[in-house]
Amino acid sequence: MAFQGHQARKRFGQHWLKDQTVLDRIVAAADLQPSDRVLEVGPGRGALTERLLSSPAAAVQAVELDRDLVDGLRERFAGDPRFSLRQGDVLELPLQLEDGVAASKVVANIPYNITGPLLDRLVGRLDRPVEPPYQRLVLLVQKQVAERIRARPGHSSFSALSVRMQLLARCTTVCPVPPRCFQPPPKVQSEVIQIDPLPADKRLPSDIARRVESLLRQAFLARRKMLRNTLASLAPEPQLQALAAAAGFQLHQRPQELAPQVWVALARGLNQGIDAASADGHDHGDGSGQGESSPGGARDQI
């Protein structure tokens, strides 16, 4: 094969998954059906690809950044017409399959240095979710990221990512993956997670979603500060206290202590206040305009 002797490259974050049990668990979690069209990110030398093609899936399209692996992958799977391959950066390429049809499921051993941006592309954010949503994503990620996704309020790992993902999808753990399961072994623990994005009719209304996203950016950029301080620009303190009481939290709390639904309740309260202000012609000083700006460079900080 063309990639025999190819060594994993640090600059691509390559760690070949070699554990047969973990490979089987990933494919089992994907629950592939004859109607499924699979997008595989980072096939490497094809260990997971082989199992995906052993499933009843209708098509498997792999996206590989490393040019030196492309010929070997095409040679290895040349006999299966369901397989296709594109070389390039998954963060930049269009994600439709070669025939222009969207994939129904995503399976990936993600290079850990692109996990955040890739989740943005595959799941989206509250104010711009991926449309249409994938039915399921099964991803091998760094354990620290998995912990942040599933963290509960008050846990040290709880973050804006926790709130966002728990409002956009059902996220569950498939299995832990220790370093010995890879070649070469990474220096961190890993985990396979299953993400089932919510259908459009189960998501937040767009105005509430935009408001929650704005609140998360504002609050978690200063996660050690009390909400009395980080939310001060939204309303005078008496009004802010009333909003907090209605949403079910106190202003001396910090953002990582609030459950996802509390953020939703706060967003609804703020939006209702803005609607009331618009109706009676008064300015309640909620400062809503500043929250609609693009997160820009703040994206990776939260």
Swiss-Prot record:
Q: Which InterPro entries does its entry note?
A: KsgA/Erm, rRNA_Ade_diMease-like_C, rRNA_Ade_Mease_Trfase_CS, rRNA_Ade_methylase_Trfase_N, rRNA_adenine_dimethylase, SAM-dependent_MTases_sf
Compartment(s) where it occurs, according to its Swiss-Prot or TrEMBL record: Cytoplasm
Q: Tell me which UniProt keywords the record has, alphabetically.
A: Cytoplasm, Methyltransferase, RNA-binding, rRNA processing, S-adenosyl-L-methionine, Transferase
Q: Which GO terms describe its cellular component?
A: cytosol
SMART domains found in the cross-reference section: rADc
Q: Region (Disordered): which ranges?
A: 275-302
Q: Which GO terms describe its molecular function?
A: 16S rRNA (adenine(1518)-N(6)/adenine(1519)-N(6))-dimethyltransferase activity; RNA binding
Query: EC number(s)?
Result: 2.1.1.182
| One Pfam assignment | RrnaAD
Provide the catalytic activity annotation.
adenosine(1518)/adenosine(1519) in 16S rRNA + 4 S-adenosyl-L-methionine = N(6)-dimethyladenosine(1518)/N(6)-dimethyladenosine(1519) in 16S rRNA + 4 S-adenosyl-L-homocysteine + 4 H(+)
- Could you say which enzyme class this protein belongs to? transferase
Q: Summarize where S-adenosyl-L-methionine binds, as residue positions.
A: H15, L17, G42, E64, D89, N109
PANTHER family attached to this UniProt entry:
DIMETHYLADENOSINE TRANSFERASE, DIMETHYLADENOSINE TRANSFERASE-RELATED
The text of the family note is:
Belongs to the class I-like SAM-binding methyltransferase superfamily. rRNA adenine N(6)-methyltransferase family. RsmA subfamily.
**Its job:** Specifically dimethylates two adjacent adenosines (A1518 and A1519) in the loop of a conserved hairpin near the 3'-end of 16S rRNA in the 30S particle. May play a critical role in biogenesis of 30S subunits.
Record-given protein name: Ribosomal RNA small subunit methyltransferase A
The uppermost taxa in this organism's lineage are: Bacteria, Bacillati, Cyanobacteriota, Cyanophyceae, Synechococcales
Gene giving rise to this polypeptide: rsmA
